[in-house]
């Protein structure tokens, strides 16, 4: 609160806490802050759910079928090493200033942590357990449902935990690049106005990535 004034720090660099609080009250009503936060949350949830489902399904498919892995691995590797957020402007050009580009960026970012964790767990599977199940005449689906799937659940949840934080990053970056709704758009909007206090308010609404990874 008093640090910026005592240290001679300009308010546009570090505004006092009272100004941030008053600005939060103002934009809560006049700028529909709650609505923009809801849009960002919806994009994060949709991107996280769809990206996680795709990553898990393809991860299990690659783990179960070496042939599928041999066919898809080169394409997945090329996509994995590409910077995912760089696709945001392209998605905006294709789909316009809607929710869809942000959701696609989130899906792309979420997809790989889940895929890699699941596939790594499938590769590290104890084959003695699989052979034991087969010795009891278990079908391929039974082996997967009773042995492989339960064994890989810790890795799956670990991937989901990482992906949940990355989904927020993907959506906000998409909104920063080409958005007219959401918290990322609000950051750009208030930055253009030189309203540092409002920027701090929006940042405070974003999930804490470090806290989510603990």
What are these model-predicted stretches?
Residues 34, 38, 42-62, 153, ...:
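Hydrophobic alpha-helical transmembrane segments of multipass integral membrane proteins
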Residues 184-214:
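Hydrophobic alpha-helical transmembrane segments of polytopic membrane proteins
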Residues 56-93, 103-106, 116-123, 131:
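Cytoplasmic-entry segments and transmembrane alpha-helices of multi-pass inner-membrane transporters
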Residues 35-43, 93-114, 157, 198-203:
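Loop-to-helix entry region at the N-terminal start of transmembrane alpha-helices
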Residues 117-162, 183, 187:
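Short cytoplasmic-facing helical segments at TM-TM junctions of multi-pass membrane proteins
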Residues 104, 108, 141-174, 204-208:
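Transmembrane alpha-helices
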Residues 24, 33, 37, 41, ...:
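Hydrophobic alpha-helical elements at and bordering transmembrane segments
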Residues 6-49:
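Periplasmic/extracellular loop-to-transmembrane helix junction in inner-membrane transport proteins
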